[in-house]
Amino acid sequence: WMQGWDYGFIFDSTVNDFVSGELEKSIVVCYKEKNPDFIIIEGQAALRNPSGPCGGEFLISCSVDGVVLQHSPKRKYYDGWEHVGALMPSLASEVALIEAYGRRVVAIALTTSKMSEKEMHGYKKSISKELNIPVFLPLEEGVLELAEILKKLRDDN
């Protein structure tokens, strides 16, 4: 019902009081009907996005086993909030915030818009070293290694 997907709901038009219940319902129905190996939950914005922070519901109500965090290293401000100087927090602090919710960041996927190949690989290497978390360039290198991480996470749980 949602552009070809059987499970989910329109997050942006759901009153916040009902978001957790809608998330839980979508996951339970999907699990009962399909019994999938994975349920991938596409996140929304960021935990500290000034236009509407969200994500806590996804982390807690969905009881996620791991987070693949999307990061845009060249972005300085939240999109659309440059005029008020809404700086993006550091990646390390975002990882720490997710961990404060009791969830683990299992990988980081980089948005490589406006980056040279040298910059892409430089960010990949430095972030992986700093945070000791696997970093991926999904558009440039694919996601096979990431899929292996997710399979291991599934098998360990």
Mark where each language-model region is.
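Flexible phosphate-sensing "switch/lid" loops adjacent to ATP/NTP-binding sites
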Residues: 1-157
